[in-house]
Regions:
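Glycine- and aromatic-enriched membrane insertion/assembly motifs of diderm outer-membrane
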Residues: 27, 45-90
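Short, structured interface segments that constitute the first stable element of a domain
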Residues: 87-120
Length: 190
């Protein structure tokens, strides 16, 4: 965590940094991509790849800084090995658990060179499909950290969503979401 703050401080002190859009402007960005998702604190699980998509609005505060907020549909979860889990019972190798979330990323974006932004924020999320897991929490909270690059309004975004809240309502499990998300979007000036 200390390294992350140090990296952010170094990026903030960069000279000659500027954004793609005029100060005071708003943009709207539809985004589509993939999640590479798993959970912490569960043995014999593997990452799974699934869909992510949504919409993000951004306000350009200065040449160096913008704020954004969005609504993302995110299929997360994990693949399993042969194991008996207290949450879902006995599962076979290769089975997947695939809850769907509506996440609300609220991000601070620091532009270090034209088009390149370092991102840090908060992300509340709400489960919209539990995939038949009765002991699953319906609220999730994570810290997204990432980078994006914009060229001619096309934006490539890569971020890691570090889950802070337990996803199961089971005392024996302290599992949290761990999601790497890659999306491609297009910024429309408003």
């Amino acid at each position: 965590m200390k390294k992350l703050f140090l990296l952010a401080a170094v990026m903030l002190s960069s000279v000659g940094a500027f954004a793609q859009h005029a100060v005071g402007s708003f943009t709207l960005q539809p985004r589509l991509g993939i999640n590479i998702a798993t959970v912490t604190d569960l043995d014999r699980t593997k990452s799974r790849v699934d869909f992510a998509g949504g919409l993000e609005a951004e306000y350009q505060v200065s040449d160096l800084f913008s704020l954004s907020g969005g609504l993302m549909y995110s299929r997360q979860g994990f693949k399993m090995e042969d194991v008996n889990l207290p949450v879902v019972g006995t599962v076979k190798k290769g089975d997947s658990w695939t809850p769907s979330y509506l996440n609300i990323p609220i991000m601070a974006n620091v532009y270090v060179v034209k088009g390149l932004a370092v991102k840090l924020g908060i992300q509340p999320g709400f489960v919209v499909d539990k995939d038949d897991a009765d002991h699953m929490e319906t609220f999730d909270f994570s810290i997204p950290v990432g980078l994006s690059y914009e060229y001619q309004n096309v934006v490539f975004d890569a971020r890691y969503n570090w889950g802070l809240t337990k996803i199961y309502d089971v005392d024996k499990l302290d599992s949290k979401n761990s999601v790497f998300q890659i999306t491609l979007g297009y910024k429309f000036d408003l």
